[in-house]
Structures are given as C-alpha cells and as structure tokens.
C-alpha cells in the first residue's frame, strides 16, 4: 500500500473529491483507508455504557486506497509514490519532486 497512517492525502474520486485529510487508520488486507473528515456516514447506535442515550452518530467510513493520492511534502500537490533503496532501507519517494517521504 502506497500510504500509511499519519500521511496527508487528497481524495481524487468519489463524493468527497478534492478534500484533504490525514489518514487515521489503514486496512491493508481490504485495501482501504480511514481519512479524517472524509466519507462521513451516520450510524445508528444502541444505548450502551459509553453512550447511554444512543441515537445517530456521524463518523468516517473507510474508502478504497486507489481513491486517494499522497500529498507531496515539498510542493503540497498530490503525487504518485515510488520506492528506492537508500542506505540499505526501502524508502518512499514522491514522483513529482523526488523528495523522500519517510
């Protein structure tokens, strides 16, 4: 997966196209990510210990990883991600600027 938790991404397709946010969680087995403030859904919650009232709660739902693009740390624009070996370690590289991401 080309993105991971804590990365700043931009949504490139879907109802939230153009929105930017930070990845809260990544689910590699399902190829999905949870992005802050994107794909908000309303969930009906039964009363429980944490929420004695119950009711309808708004929360983020996961979106497919192919619908997001990493934001280049140098230019602030969406970029594709490449990989290269640096000092014996595999690092992510922004295709647009060539900047090392992590």
Curated annotation (Swiss-Prot):
Keyword set for this entry?
Ribonucleoprotein, Ribosomal protein, RNA-binding, rRNA-binding
Keyword Transport: yes or no? no
Q: Which GO terms describe its molecular function?
A: rRNA binding; structural constituent of ribosome
What the entry lists under InterPro entries is as follows: KOW, Rib_uL2_dom2, Ribosomal_uL24, Ribosomal_uL24_CS, Ribosomal_uL24_KOW, Translation_prot_SH3-like_sf
User: What Gene3D superfamilies does the record point to?
Assistant: 2.30.30.30
Per the record, its GO cellular-component terms are:
ribonucleoprotein complex; ribosome
Could you tell me the superkingdom of the organism this chain comes from? Bacteria
* Any one biological process term the GO annotation gives: translation
Which cysteine residues pair off into disulfide bonds?
A: none
Q: Which NCBIfam families did the record assign?
A: rplX_bact
Q: Which family does it belong to?
A: Belongs to the universal ribosomal protein uL24 family.
| Assembly information from the UniProt record | Part of the 50S ribosomal subunit.
Protein name as catalogued: Large ribosomal subunit protein uL24
Q: What's the source species' lineage?
A: Bacteria, Bacillati, Bacillota, Bacilli, Bacillales
